[in-house]
Amino acid sequence: MCSAPGGKSFAAAALMHGEGRIMSYDLYESKLSLIREGAERLGIEIITAAARDSSQPDPDCIGAADCVICDVPCSGFGVLAKKPDMRARVGERIADSELPQLQSRILAAASLYPRVGGRLLYSTCTLNRHENEEQVEAFLAQNSGYSCEQMHTVFPDPDLPAYLRTDGFFYAVLIRNT
């Protein structure tokens, strides 16, 4: 979900050794060529890219997936080193924007797709707790059928990604229990 440009789909395909099927969704049709071209360049045949609004549940996918990667739109504070234009906005209150509400809707829709025992990976490229830990904690409080297997912010010093010229990101692996 929110798959363009396709890096996580490509990594998942490599882990799957060409077995199974990956559905890579993105809101914008114009971004799907990045996924399709990347898959072709890498010789990956198990990826199908399609345009869809990930914040809206797809009845055809409910309970059908072993694993769902939910890489939501975010403020991007973990990739400031790559995006100098964002540095000027660091002081802005991005967390108070509509992003957390959109993230919550996408996570809620994504949570319908794993089978019982399946996994849901929630990820962002931000270090903002409001978009990360707090988002997952709120989801778990409202969804007793899920538990958290692991939750981790990846960056040695969450305050300094731009200065050290490295990226930071967050992920949580959730298990569907019922």
Positions of PLM-derived features:
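S-adenosylmethionine
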Residues: 1-178
